[in-house]
């Protein structure tokens, strides 16, 4: 099965199309400057990078451009969306609610929104990507993959080490180490 992996930032979108059986990357790319002037780098496996500057006023447009690149007659790697079995979305913060990846439902979206207080730059952007993919690829399973899930498998003494207990008891704060630590 081919899986489209999406990592949305506030003005960027990284993607890979992966054959899950062989674990090979069929194509990868980056949409940058979404909402500004747009820049795309697309690289099918074994081919040179293709760079262009299509208008990308929003993430939905950017994801549409990614789909067009993946299905392009000359530089695409699949003939249609029918060859994609699922979409995986990087979600930075799932709080204590998510200990592993999960299918995205309305309830999952609501809970990720609630966790956005802990990742205000990343979670809203991730959800924009989820909603855009749901619109453009209806019926495809969407999966949330949480950066914080690893931390939910740690013993309490490890994730509370270094912070006063009251921060956890009153606000749900935990000690996480990741690239989102600046938030």
Features from the language model and the residues they span:
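Extreme N-terminal starter segment of soluble prokaryotic enzymes
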Residues: 1-3
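Short beta-strand-loop/turn "lid" adjacent to the catalytic site in phosphate-handling enzymes
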Residues: 76-122, 143, 150-160
């Amino acid at each position: 099965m081919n899986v489209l992996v999406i990592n949305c930032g506030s003005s960027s979108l990284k993607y890979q199309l992966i054959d899950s059986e062989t674990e090979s990357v069929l194509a990868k790319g980056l949409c940058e400057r979404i909402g500004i002037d747009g820049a795309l780098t697309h690289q099918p496996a074994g081919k040179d990078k293709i760079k262009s500057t299509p208008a990308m006023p929003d993430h939905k447009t950017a994801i549409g451009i990614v789909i067009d690149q993946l299905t392009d007659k000359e530089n695409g790697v699949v003939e249609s969306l029918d060859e994609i079995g699922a979409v995986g979305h990087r979600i930075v913060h799932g709080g204590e609610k998510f200990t592993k990846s999960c299918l995205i439902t309305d309830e999952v979206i609501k809970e990720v929104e609630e966790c956005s207080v802990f990742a205000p730059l990343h979670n809203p952007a991730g959800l924009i990507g989820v909603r855009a993919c749901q619109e453009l690829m209806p019926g495809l399973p969407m999966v949330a993959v949480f950066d914080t899930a690893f931390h939910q498998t740690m013993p309490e003494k490890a994730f509370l080490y270094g912070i006063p207990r009251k921060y956890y008891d009153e606000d749900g704060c935990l000690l996480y180490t990741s690239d989102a630590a600046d938030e």
